[in-house]
Amino acid sequence: TPIFVRKDSGMRTIADLKGKRVTMGYSAMRNIDQVTRAMLATARLTEADIKPVLVPNVVRSADDFVASNADMFFFAFGGPKVREADVSVGGIRALEIDPAGMPAARKIMAWGYLTDVAPGPAFTGVEKPMKIYSFDNVLITHAKAPDDLIYKLLDSMVQTKADLVAIAPPLQEFSAAFGYRA
């Protein structure tokens, strides 16, 4: 999941966010605030190095970016909002992550990792092969949720993988083994 900036901004890496207006807080999506902090840490940046723009969620992050109230936005590849922002501002660019910064990021969010992406229809804003910050989505249930219900959910996702990928191409990496981690 990348951080996007205007294509004509001159920014190419997370380090270029220093002094910029960066969406933070994500009061309705608390995990995204931690993800943003971890991504900043890959470039040795903290909240003190940027101008925080508080938002409740990723949609508002994109809206503030399009309205020129923020210099970046955070959103998953494949989301219609990404294409909307791309068209609205005349082009966007995904910022590259420096792998050398991952130890600092893992101090904030231990389960983050890098994914290789390349230009393509599903990867709006990617101009060249690069690494982006990734994290797994988590399905949380209550302790009494039957195991067979979770199995059926994952099996349904495996059986309809082609449909899922058609809607969200990054899910091409999904597998039953990848989808279950205790």
Show where each model-derived region lies.
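Short intrinsically disordered coil segments
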Residues: 18-22, 109-113, 154-156
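Short glycine-/acidic-enriched loop or helix-start segments at secondary-structure transitions
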Residues: 34, 84-85, 150
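Generic hydrophobic/packing signal
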Residues: 4, 23, 28-31, 44, ...
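Segments of small-molecule ligand-sensing domains
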Residues: 130-182
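Bilobed "Venus flytrap"/periplasmic-binding protein-like clamshell domains
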Residues: 2-67, 161-165
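Pocket-lining segment of extracytoplasmic ligand-binding domains
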Residues: 9, 41, 46-146
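Proteins with a high burden of low-complexity, intrinsically disordered sequence enriched in S/T/G/P/A and R
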Residues: 1-5, 15, 110, 115-120, ...
